A protein has these predicted regions:
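Short acidic low-complexity segments
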Residues: 10-22
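Predominantly a Rossmann-like dinucleotide-binding segment in NAD(P)-dependent oxidoreductases
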Residues: 83-179
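NAD(P)-binding Rossmann-fold cofactor-contacting core
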Residues: 1-5
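Short, Asp-centered acidic motifs that coordinate Mg2+ and/or phosphate
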Residues: 10, 25-26, 106
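Beta-strand-loop-alpha-helix segment that lines the small-molecule cofactor/substrate pocket
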Residues: 26, 32-33, 37-84, 99
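Short glycine-/small-residue-rich Rossmann-like dinucleotide-binding loops
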Residues: 23, 31-32, 202
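Short, structured coil segments at secondary-structure junctions
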Residues: 7-8, 46, 148
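Contiguous beta-strand/loop segments that form the cofactor/metal-binding neighborhood of enzyme cores
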Residues: 143-234
């Protein structure tokens, strides 16, 4: 915080100092996943709205508790991802609603890379409970699919971990080891309320692949949706 304050000429304050500041109405919560609920809850108790990084909480029960508290306090809580509101997500939705590919019946999404330890300065939390490929990045894909297809009815999945230890190759901690405490590969399928079925592959155990990020198959055509980590991108339709 001190380094950022010096670089951008802003104040570095503790969490308590920020929460006690009456001029601040909205908290942007960019802490690690394990701290999300605590910061959101403290923000609400101090009369402040909160927009948080994903995931909203460590589990479903905590998420419901946050929703209940926000409603009781009459405050707003938002959470990433919001990329589905961008041009690509909204254009894809418009095309589906206009029946350009017919009813969506099948699909795939693939999130495949070799993790975060090669670029992030402090990547440990990515491999702890509350993170991993689904909670950290997969939620962008799932949110986009809910935007395009609707609610999920059920899920089937298996998970695994390729290695129990990762080596940091980014600076300033090059060579340090990370203990892996959450699955780094998850594979499965989503069944939506409209009976569409989407197969998924989320992993940080793959060096390279040539899969599209999201492909949707309708009764009258197919659609390739661009990477939902971004707000824009090229949509491809084939018939």
């Amino acid at each position: 915080a001190s380094n950022a304050a010096s670089k951008y000429n802003v104040k570095a304050l503790s969490v308590d100092e920020i929460l006690e500041n009456k001029e601040i109405e909205l908290i942007i919560n960019l802490t690690i996943p394990a701290a999300h609920k605590e910061i959101i809850t403290k923000s609400l108790f101090n009369g402040k709205h909160c927009f948080s990084e994903k995931p909203l909480a460590m589990n479903f029960t905590e998420g419901i508790e946050i929703e209940k508290l926000a409603n009781e306090k009459g405050l707003y809580v938002g959470c990433a991802p919001d990329t589905f509101l961008g041009a690509a997500g909204q254009k894809a939705r418009k095309l589906i609603e206009d029946n350009k590919v017919g009813k969506i019946v099948l699909g795939t999404f693939n999130l495949m890379s070799h993790g975060m330890e090669h670029w992030h300065p402090n990547p440990d939390f990515f491999f702890k409970p509350g993170a991993g490929p689904v909670f950290d990045v997969g939620v962008y894909y799932i949110t986009q699919l809910v935007n395009l297809i609707g609610p999920v009815k059920q899920i089937n999945a298996i998970s695994g971990t390729a290695t129990n230890e990762r080596t940091i190759t980014s600076q300033p901690r090059y060579g340090d080891k990370i203990k892996v405490e959450t699955p780094t590969t998850l594979m499965g399928s989503l069944e939506f309320q409209n009976n569409a079925k989407v197969q998924f592959f989320c992993t940080w155990d793959v060096w390279k692949n040539n899969h599209s990020t999201i492909e949707l198959y309708g009764l009258d055509g197919s659609m390739i949706v661009p990477d939902p980590n971004f707000f824009s991108g090229d949509l491809l339709i084939s018939k």
